[in-house]
Amino acid sequence: MTRFLSEPTSTPCEIAMKSLATCLALLLALPTFAVAANPPSWRAGAVSTRITPEQPMWMAGYASRTAPSEGVELDLFAKALVLVDGEGEKFALVTMDLIGVPRSLRLTVAERVEQQFGIKPSHLTINASHTHSGPELRTSKLWGVDDVALRQEEAGEYTAELERQLVRMVGEALAKAAPAKVDYCSSTCGFAMNRRTPDGQGGWKNFPNPDGPVDHRVPVLKVSGIDGQELAIVFGYACHCTTLGHQKFSGDYAGYAQQQIEANHPGVVALFMNGCSGDQNPYPRKTMELAQTHGQTLATAVEAALGTTTRPIVGTIRAAYREIPLAYESLPTREQLKEEQTSPDKWVATHATRVLQRLDEEGTLPKDYPYPVQVLRIGSDLTWVTLGGEVVVDYSLRLGRELPGPIVWVSGYSNDVMGYIPSQRVWDEGGYEGGGAMVYGTHPSRWASRVEEQIVDTVKELRESLE
């Protein structure tokens, strides 16, 4: 029989030894094959930047303030988390220890983030903690304030630098993105209380109401590296950041909660997402010690959540974003506004002057406002709804009941904060959140009555589009 020169002969013993060696090699290679076949479903990166003004500035949140800031009690921060799924789809979350999100800031940051990093506007969320101890972000002559030119300049310079910092942070978080896992958990926290109380005369006053609706849930998203090192902890709560009312910059209870969580978890970036807290206040309030106590309480609730059985979040990122025209109830005539200018109520008269100035400058008053609604699907289980404005608690309670899926997280103060967003119940009742607060801005009137149905219907449509 002819043999090929390349085909060696082997004894039975040699054949057995070769087979054993082959089996060992395959066994050693199995972990590598397993990792390659089941790579981490996420990549993630997070960064934090101090945004406390270097100089005194006028502060946002309370119309009664008569002077600029007088120092810093607790630094303010902006933070960014970027998630990338296994298909390369990206989501960027930005949180800020500030009063709100101006529409112009959202538009500018979204445009730059898409151009520079390929993150679509629908996949960007910007949330404000709504602290009333931060700088004002927008001031114009329409507001009729003292030192208007200086305040316009300061607010404009601060906001322009903030926009640059937010874009930079998203880029840095994306550049840091590394293989990660994401887990969801939750607990509860009890210092928020409904602040709408009947005044006994058919109206409503701002006063703690222990019988009013609340949302005490504390949703938590933990992002960890594949080595188990925690990278970011995102947590939410539905409560106004109004423990404090002084003249020093501070993130209020939300700032203290983030500070405590980061101390408990070295290397972590803690990001706070305010919920549907338009009618929710922290109680008791008005002292620094109480702000610290509430912050510690919320941080403890986050620790309690992390100690429960967490739910792994796996899958892809899907997002939908729409601006819907929220109609105003009615548009005042020039004659009506001139009459209101003579009102003995200072704020009614001031509002009339602002709206008249707007009418003179723009030629007409808008019939509606472009209101942002965003729905995110993070993995297969988490539906995250973000709504603009100071949304009252009824929205998170209703959407939690009516949306499908095991996890529904609803955040307010996102992508634009233009005023209070009442539910139908609150609109019917009236009062501050029902429309009375509009006198402190430049909206021509309160919203039309079907605002809740319009928003909820849009949320459901967007959620269905992501199936």
Model feature map: region roles:
Residues 7-16:
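Short, Lys/Arg-enriched N-terminal segments with co-localized hydrophobic residues
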Residues 37-127, 131-269, 273-277, 283-293, ...:
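Conserved beta-alpha junction segments in alpha/beta enzyme cores
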Residues 21-32:
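Bacterial N-terminal signal peptides
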Residues 298:
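Anionic-ligand-binding alpha/beta catalytic cores of soluble enzymes and soluble regulatory domains
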